[in-house]
Amino acid sequence: GDVWITPTMVTLESVHPSFQPPDEAWLDYLSPELGERMGQAPAYLDEEGAACLAGALTKQREFVRRVHERGGLVLARTDPVSPKLVPGYGLHAEMANLVRAGLSPLQAISVASRNGAVALGLADEIGTLEPGKRADLVVVRGDPATDIARIGNTVWVFKAGVRYDPATLRESARGKIGLPTG
C-alpha cells in the first residue's frame, strides 16, 4: 500500500500506571538508576489522565487494524523512552499489541521482520527466510504463530552466521540497560 504507519503502541502503553514487564526478571537488565524509576508513574498522569491514555490506546489499536485490513504497511518499533520499556521486551510487547489490534500472531511476526525490510527497500535481501537472503534468526520454543507470547521463549540466536546462547547474551546485558553513554 501507499500508507505506512509505525504505531509504537507499546510506547503509549508503557506510560500507563498498570503497565508492567512480563516478570520481575526483566528488572535485572536495568541499570540501578533506571530500576529505581521503574515503578514511578509520570507525575502528570492522574486517574483521569490514565483513563484517557487507555482510551487512546484502544483507538490506536483500532486504527492499526483498519490500516492493516486496507493494505497499509504496518511497521514495528518501540521508542524506548519509558523506564518500563525494556529493549527486546518492548518489541515483544509491541507484537502483542498488534495481536490485540486484530492481527494474527503470524502477521505480527511479519510486521516485526518482513515489513521493515519492505520499508527500507531491502525485501530482496532481508526480512524473510529464503535461499539467497541474509538473515539473523531467533529460534524459540513453542509456536509463536499460534501464541505470540511464545516469541520470548528464546532457545538460540543466530547473528551473521554465529550461534549465540541466549543466557550468555542476557548475562552480558544484566544491569546495563539505561546506563549513560560516553
Q: PLM ranges: what are they?
A:
Residues 14-15, 148, 167:
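Glycine/Thr-rich phosphate-binding loops of Rossmann-like dinucleotide-binding domains
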Residues 1-101, 174-182:
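Active-site neighborhoods of metal-dependent hydrolases
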Residues 156, 160-182:
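Extracellular/periplasmic ectodomains of large secreted or surface enzymes and adhesion receptors
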Residues 64-68, 95-99, 109, 113, ...:
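Generic hydrophobic alpha-helical scaffold/packing signal
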